[in-house]
């Protein structure tokens, strides 16, 4: 797909066709984006940002339920490129978890006894942000970790032939000397990988000597390598993305007995892990393949990555300094940080202090249930010959209705209305239309942020 996009944009005639579909979406996103983002910048929001909260209105009938819809166009139009079967499974899972699951964890005596902290912290009238943060930390985080582990195991099992083929190809390449006209020698690449990864483990152990060194060694050299193989193999065979489950390192640390850690080490071991490869391997391999298909040297791609990393790091430092001079982070000056950063801080604090209820039994149970449900969904899809996928199960587990509802609405509009109305023309144009909408809204958001920074620049602190 990436190579096709490059070829498309390189063709003058086809580029004009793309622009014909791109610009209507761009203008729609630009106009809506200005209405959405400039209002808060000027002090009188016309549309609630980032979502419309219905939780307070439904708390009497469904206590603890997370109910709301995003006001950004991103999940709405993004759903247009998601197959209807996947979005339907995602919506059903999201409602089952974040609406009915949250409610039952408060009202059902048996479930209430399993999550006493959630029952103690909830109160009538709690807004959506607090309900989402508290329920994720007190109820769903251990379940999500176990489910991610189970789903990762299922994906590896499903694509075991591709992963095995990758291993055989790597072995044969090493045996034959590796390398090629456009790629560096494989032995050199492997030596660089092992050296840098081992150096990361050595630095980690030097800074945290009281933590068992076997854990970072296994995670970096074994698990990271296997995850990289799996990610590249799965992307190459199916195009589907795959990465290590979230909080994998945190879970391993949580379950590892290390009584001699100092308070500083007890915190640092969670938030400063060694290098664990695999999360970006699939995307990187896909980019290199697209470069080869379009006649681009892979070495040039690596140079661009290095330059972009260095430039991005410099810009990030300068931007962070400027933002902190304008206002504290998090604060009302940066609305999204008020939603996201407290939840992240709570999760870090509860992990470090062992305040979460994470047990091998809970992880194994949620992993087993996830594997069973995913296998049942895949079997049902093959039996009924409908396009449902177990990936929707994971999307719904990690996506509250704020985004799951708009995603399903966009997918239904695309599949049931626009495709029937415009036929193949819509299939050819939808990606470009969606890109145009996101481009327009992104430009409006950028202008709004710049305007907000200029308006608040008078807050600059003297240091």
What are these regions (language model features)?
Residues 1-463:
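Alpha-helical multipass membrane-protein architecture
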């Amino acid at each position: 797909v990436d190579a096709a996009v490059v070829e498309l944009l390189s063709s003058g005639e086809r580029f004009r066709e793309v622009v014909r579909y791109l610009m209507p979406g761009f203008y729609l996103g630009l106009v809506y984006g200005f209405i959405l983002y400039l209002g808060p910048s000027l002090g009188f929001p016309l549309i609630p940002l980032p979502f419309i909260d219905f939780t307070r209105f439904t708390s009497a009938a469904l206590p603890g339920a997370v109910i709301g819809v995003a006001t950004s166009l991103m999940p709405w139009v993004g759903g247009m490129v998601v197959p209807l079967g996947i979005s339907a499974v995602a919506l059903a899972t999201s409602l089952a978890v974040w609406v009915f699951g949250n409610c039952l964890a408060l009202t059902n005596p048996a479930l209430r006894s399993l999550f006493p902290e959630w029952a103690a912290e909830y109160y009538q009238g709690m807004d959506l942000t607090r309900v989402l943060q508290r329920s994720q930390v007190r109820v769903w985080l251990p379940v999500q970790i176990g489910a991610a582990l189970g789903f990762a195991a299922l994906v590896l099992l499903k694509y075991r032939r591709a992963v095995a083929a990758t291993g055989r190809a790597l072995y044969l390449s090493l045996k034959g000397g590796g390398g090629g006209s456009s790629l560096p020698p494989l032995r050199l690449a492997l030596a660089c990988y092992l050296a840098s990864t081992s150096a990361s483990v050595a630095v980690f152990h030097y800074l945290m000597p009281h933590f068992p060194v076997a854990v970072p060694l296994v995670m970096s050299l074994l698990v990271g390598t296997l995850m990289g193989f799996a990610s590249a193999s799965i992307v190459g065979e199916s195009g589907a993305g795959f990465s290590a489950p979230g909080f994998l390192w945190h879970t391993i640390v949580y379950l590892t007995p290390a009584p001699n850690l100092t308070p500083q080490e007890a915190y640092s071991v969670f938030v400063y892990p060694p290098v664990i490869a695999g999360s970006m391997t699939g995307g990187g391999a896909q980019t290199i393949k697209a470069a080869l298909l379009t006649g681009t040297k892979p070495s040039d791609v690596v140079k661009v990555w290095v330059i972009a990393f260095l430039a991005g790091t410099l810009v990030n430092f300068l931007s962070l300094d400027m933002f902190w001079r304008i206002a504290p982070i998090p604060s009302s000056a940066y609305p999204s940080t008020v939603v996201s950063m407290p939840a992240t801080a709570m999760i870090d604090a509860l992990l470090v202090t062992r305040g979460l209820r994470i047990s091998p039994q809970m992880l194994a149970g949620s992993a087993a249930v996830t594997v069973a449900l995913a296998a049942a969904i895949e079997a049902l899809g093959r039996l009924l010959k409908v396009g449902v996928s177990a990936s929707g199960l994971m999307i719904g587990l990690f996506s509250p209705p704020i985004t799951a509802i708009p995603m399903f609405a966009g997918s239904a509009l695309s599949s049931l209305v626009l495709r029937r109305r415009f036929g193949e023309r819509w299939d050819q144009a939808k990606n470009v239309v969606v890109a145009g909408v996101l481009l327009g809204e992104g430009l409006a958001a950028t202008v709004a942020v710049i305007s907000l920074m200029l308006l608040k620049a008078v807050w600059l602190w003297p240091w």
